């Protein structure tokens, strides 16, 4: 009887220990490591290739600061079009990272633009390109011959309101 109980407990213990290992393996394999590269910190992953960095300050219609979320980086692909609607969508995601589903974007600052700075190998100098945010949008240029991970930066104030 004692041998049977010990055998049963051993089998039960082994089942529980292996189930925790397989859950960790399946969780780690579902993360697409191809889109991100590991930074200095083990918990930080930087996008590989072009990315849109959204760094905004949420203000009310009178200009009072309501929210200042951390910047968020979104992978983007050369050749895709970034319209005003898509950019507002990314901004709302950045707001949700700090205050989930609390605020909605009313409008972007009219002077808001997206900028990318890189070293132009042909001109042998640093270049900054600016792209206005419009309904029609702009096509993300392929800068792979100049820089590996070009960061397209949106740093602006955004009029927001509570949902």
Swiss-Prot record:
Leader sequence segment: 1-27
Coiled-coil region: none
Highest taxon in the source lineage: Bacteria
InterPro entries per record: SAK, SAK/SK_sf
Keyword set includes Signal: yes
GO cellular component, as recorded: extracellular region
Protein localization: Secreted
Gene3D superfamilies attached to this UniProt entry: 3.10.20.130
Disulfide bonds: none
UniProtKB keywords: Plasminogen activation, Secreted, Signal
Function text: Potent plasminogen activator that converts plasminogen into plasmin. It forms a 1:1 complex with plasmin, which in turn activates other plasminogen molecules.
Family: Belongs to the staphylokinase family.
Protein name as annotated: Staphylokinase
Organism this protein belongs to: Staphylococcus aureus (strain N315)
């Amino acid at each position: 009887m004692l041998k049977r109980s010990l055998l049963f407990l051993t089998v039960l213990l082994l089942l529980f220990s292996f189930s925790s290992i397989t859950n960790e393996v399946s969780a780690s394999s579902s993360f697409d490591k191809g889109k991100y590269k590991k930074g200095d910190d083990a918990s930080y992953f930087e996008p590989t290739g072009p990315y849109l960095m959204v760094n905004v300050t949420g203000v009310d219609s009178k200009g009072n600061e309501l929210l200042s979320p951390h910047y968020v980086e979104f992978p983007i692909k050369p050749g895709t079009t970034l319209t005003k609607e898509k950019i507002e969508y990314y901004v709302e995601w950045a707001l949700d990272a700090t205050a989930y589903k609390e605020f909605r974007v009313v409008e972007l600052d009219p002077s808001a633009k997206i900028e990318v700075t890189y070293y132009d190998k042909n001109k042998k100098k640093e270049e900054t390109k600016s792209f206005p945010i419009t309904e029609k949008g702009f096509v993300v240029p392929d800068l792979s011959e100049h820089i590996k991970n070009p960061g397209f930066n949106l740093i602006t104030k955004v009029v927001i309101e509570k949902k």
